[in-house]
């Protein structure tokens, strides 16, 4: 086993604080409308330029093992805030640094670390309740656009795009961010349900100019099996031909004689048909077929429940206003399924989302909800260079998470004002003993840190601005972008409550652990390990 280097008490804490400061100082230059960029070197290709706190934090590794432990613990704060709310990583880092710095000063002055931690925890719990009381719902698209703008580092076009996307696909809809091809940002909205499976034969194409199959008011046959024998399908095909409508077949696969017969029928104009493979694999395919059945008012023909394809009637088929199929995707527009059944199915999937353990499963389930409930919007980010594209895409992603968080838990005044107001309200808070009271003061003083940092990055004097903001009331604050005071809500400077809450909770959690650290252990570098004495001769 490798030899260890052990540090105790103040020696350990000083090293740890140095690591915290290196990481936090690198991250906090990005805070606020006048935050600066950080350039990250890559082992290959162009360097990355970013204003995203968590991206900066993830890049930092320090040579000194003890300092590195401090830095890694604060990195955890940024990552956790990012996972919970998708934004607020820089705010969380600034808060953590402030609580740790003040807390370690108190420990050095002889306070009991455990009591300090209890005081900090009490202040944070009370602050979270106050934040909830200050929070106002974020429902109209103007507020959504403002939240998106602030989170994308004051880029108004991004805020407007996200608000427009949410308008189109609803609050539950899926919004994805992709690389664009031009210089301008674009928004593509896919209404209805779309899945990644195209036509099984190009002979089904009836719109050669677009290379797509477009069928108006078709019947939709859903089968959880491979179809290779045309005899199984004859009754359904005859019924559909009599009804004079087109038919879309969504099955595990359609092959051989069955596919050939469908192609011949289509080319001769006897019955318009298009066949596609069902989306997904295994159990997920069964679930997605059931989703399509709910949306179109049809039934999945599955041998598992004793249904046979030969016995299927028009009653078992789903219907939609229009189906568009191209090489890679199928879109079902305006299925005739009952609203109550669709909502029931959405509720069922939401329950599964709550119980899902892996992020991948949760993401797939959320996609299914979106496809049933609204639609899918794609924001295509435009930029002049690859480097700018990456930076902008990261900002749009942040803004998207922030707006989702705002819709979920509401918004508070931005620019660090909400935390200053909360700290003022809790000024009279006391605990069981003097050391715990100091812990409360440490947390309340730290709540001013984000405002101070925003002002500092804007090149103003933090103490003067902080005192002016404290002298005001309600949403009165400082707009660092225009360097004026006023109502933050009127300025359109809003922060999602969830982002502010998560930043404070995670910062306090890790800071509390670091304040109560008394010993640090790390491996000695190989060269520093004590040499073993040469073995003597046996006597």
From Swiss-Prot:
GO CC, one annotated term: cytoplasm
Domain of life: Bacteria
Principal location class: cytoplasm
EC number: 5.6.1.7
UniProt binding sites for ATP: 30-33, 51, 87-91, 415, 479-481, 495
Protein family per UniProt: Belongs to the chaperonin (HSP60) family.
This protein's name: Chaperonin GroEL
Protein's organism: Enterobacter asburiae
